[in-house]
Amino acid sequence: MPYQIAVTNNSPRFKIVLPFLSISLGLIIALCGDSFKSDSVSYLDMGDYFFQGDWRAILNGLWSPLFAIVHGLSRWLFKPTMRWEPTLVQLTNFFVFVSTVLAFQFFWSEVFRLYRLLSQREPQPSSSCFSENEFWGFGYAIFLFMHLNLVTCTTPDMLLSTIVYSSAGLILKIKLSGATSLRFWLLGLLLGVGFLTKAVMLPLATVFLMAAVLSNLRQRLLLFYLLAALVAFAGVVSPYVYELSREKGHFTTGEAAKLNYAWHENGAPFTHWQGEIAHLGKAEHPTRKLFSSPLIYEFARPVRGTYPPWYDPSYWNGGLRVQFELGNQLRALVKHLNTYLRDLWSQNVLIACCLVLVALRQDIRPILHDFLSVWYLWLPAVAAFALYGLVWVEYRYIAQFFVLFWAAVLTLVRLPAHNHSRRTIRAITIVAVFLLTIQIGTNLVRECIDGHRAASLQMDIAEGLAAQGVRPGERVTLIDADLGAGWQKLARLVVVAEIPFEERETFWSLDIAKRNEIYQVLAKTGGSVLIAPEVPHWAPTTSWQRVGSTPVYIYRLHP
């Protein structure tokens, strides 16, 4: 039987204003943001190839397909020029953020229903609680604090937030309103889409399904409902896994976990692994080393992309094996624990205000009991923290899971009834929202300024290269390739060889005769120019041309 809950709707307009305010702030930050961060270029390449008719382009061992398809669709529909491409990328990111806001709205409405239910079941029904306005205001302040600075990040993390909030909200819906085959089927469907968004959702899907099942053990048809969820999940995941396995020549659900563990825990290089670490395996098809001092690597074929070594690292790292080493793992856990503590410290306002609100209940036993009773709300977050903690942690990976954790904490706020309880809750809520708003505003201004500066530089480089005759589709070579350099994508370049960052000073220290030898080697790769994103102030730049007023220089390999 579903629970019967009396929810007080004392300000329906407030719940409408909050998402519109969030969407407006998201639009502001999107329009002045940096379009190309981290792994963005690889996702954009995948989407472009997919909508050019190569559907197998999304069968990538590292990057999941859904985010690439979303961006590929917008670029295929609008076909932006170079000048408008960053704007289109950011508008696409913005619409992903809108989906996250809507998913959070659904999730938070279910959290509020749960909070009201728990409050009504208190042995002292007159206990003081959040009003509806306070609960929603606090919730959106947390949401914006966690997510607003990620709007411009062209990675699938915001899209995954949409899936996480929708799935968590649906679990609460099942808990509060009763299980049905349709709700479990939708949950399985969402989790399958989550896997197509980021591979980490494959193990996390187990946790979400476990939360849905174990929180509804009294349901008579529970096994049937679970089967409906599993069928939906398999229906989404299986075709992709089948085709990916065919593409890679062996069964695989993706290589993200293996590659990240090898990079972060085993010390394998992110690019140009040559099998130099013997216990990690033998390189099956590494990038080709053309020169030893400085090191030069060529990768014109068979993988395409703006920067092929990062378009599909699973190909170039074929033969790589991960090794579990207890010492390395313990060091990684300590390092990642420090990362979590640093992220928590940035949330000191939340910690302080929630700690005061919960501590005012005075008795620790009911607090622990109540927190454990909403395990289905915080368990997926703890599981995500544990999974990332084993391998690698970045804030953008875990922002949505912090929100789930704080949602569970806010359900504990039920103070003993006395004259000052309501005023205490209201005062602390106002202080928390006010301080979080200041931090949100500060982050918004910083993101707008830094994002606009970075986006302008990328555009200046791309347009400067075009002005100097470097055409779209042209093959180029690089000194110190930047994995997140959007100017390469904007200029439609194809990087075929590079001198890595750590070899930069070696190259610039060479005499003219030796450098001419390097130029001849690079020319044989098919690259028309050598591009140096930065040149040391002491380095000779004879025969090099500066790209406008940017720090980039080019050298023509084929005069």
What annotation goes with each model-predicted range?
Residues 247, 259, 424-485:
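Membrane-embedded, lumen/periplasm-facing catalytic core of multi-pass transferases
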Residues 38, 63, 149-160:
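Short acidic/glycine- and proline-prone juxtamembrane loop motifs at membrane-interface regions
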Residues 7, 126-131, 167-183, 194, ...:
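Membrane-interface transmembrane helices that cradle and orient dolichyl/undecaprenyl
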Residues 266-367, 374, 498-502:
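Lumenal/periplasmic acceptor-binding loop at the mouth of the active site in multi-pass
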Residues 282-283, 287-293, 455-456, 466-504, ...:
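Short periplasmic/luminal acceptor-recognition loop of GT-C membrane glycosyltransferases, typified by
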Residues 139, 144-146, 159-177, 183-191, ...:
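Specific aromatic-rich, kink-prone transmembrane helix
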Residues 32-46, 57-74, 83-87, 248-255, ...:
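Extracytoplasmic catalytic/substrate-binding loops of multi-pass membrane glycan-assembly enzymes
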Residues 91-126, 166:
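Transmembrane-helix motifs of polytopic, lipid-linked glycan transferases
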